[in-house]
């Protein structure tokens, strides 16, 4: 049985209520993200904390709340969606986004080694850019939208933008 749930993954009470509503969980697929655009000089403390809260704290809260159910069964999968912006090369104008997604990669590695012997697998998916309405908005705000689109595509390992349905 596949069950999906949309909830504010930064809200401890809502996450606890969700955890209480499920008897068991086999897979946590955590796809949460907030993209702040710009360099360190463009990122004020409010955007910094929002990015940490949405991109990192939510993964901690969901994983730490649902992990005990998996540990009881001695099996489970935690899959965290990170980003190609977290890689060593980085991505231009993605200071805090890339930073938080890199933190998620460390988070996943630490959980993986801590719980693999308990039957829990932890992995990260690092997708490239997904062509969404917010992506179109961002590109259209560029000085040269056509060139911005080309630049985005050139940074993608697969030579194109990912589609939401993928």
PLM feature segments, named:
Residues 63, 100, 108:
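Active-site helix of classical SDR
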Residues 39-40, 47-49, 152:
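Substrate-binding pocket helix/loop in short-chain dehydrogenase/reductase
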Residues 127-137:
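Short, flexible catalytic-loop segment of classical short-chain dehydrogenase/reductase
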Residues 43, 89-98, 110, 138:
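Active-site loop-to-helix junction immediately N-terminal to the catalytic Tyr of the SDR YXXXK motif
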Residues 83:
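Residue(s) in the substrate-gating loop at a strand-loop-helix junction
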Residues 32-36:
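Conserved NAD(P)H cofactor-binding loop of Rossmann-fold oxidoreductase domains
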Residues 68, 113-114:
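Alpha-helical segment proximal to the catalytic Tyr-Lys
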């Amino acid at each position: 049985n596949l069950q999906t749930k949309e909830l504010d993954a930064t809200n401890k009470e809502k996450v606890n209520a969700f955890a209480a509503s499920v008897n068991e969980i086999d897979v946590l697929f955590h796809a949460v993200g907030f993209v702040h655009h710009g360099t360190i000089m463009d990122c004020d403390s409010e955007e910094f904390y929002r990015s940490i809260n949405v991109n990192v704290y939510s993964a901690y809260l969901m994983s730490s709340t649902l992990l005990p159910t998996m540990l009881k069964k001695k099996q489970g999968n935690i899959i965290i969606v990170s980003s190609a912006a977290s890689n060593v090369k980085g991505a231009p104008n993605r200071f805090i986004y890339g930073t938080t997604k890199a933190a998620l990669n460390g988070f996943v590695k630490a959980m993986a080694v801590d719980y693999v012997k308990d039957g829990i697998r932890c992995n990260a998916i690092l997708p490239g850019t997904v062509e969404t309405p917010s992506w179109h908005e961002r590109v259209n705000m560029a000085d040269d939208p056509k060139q911005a689109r080309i630049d985005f595509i050139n940074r993608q390992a697969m030579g194109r933008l990912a589609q939401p349905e993928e």
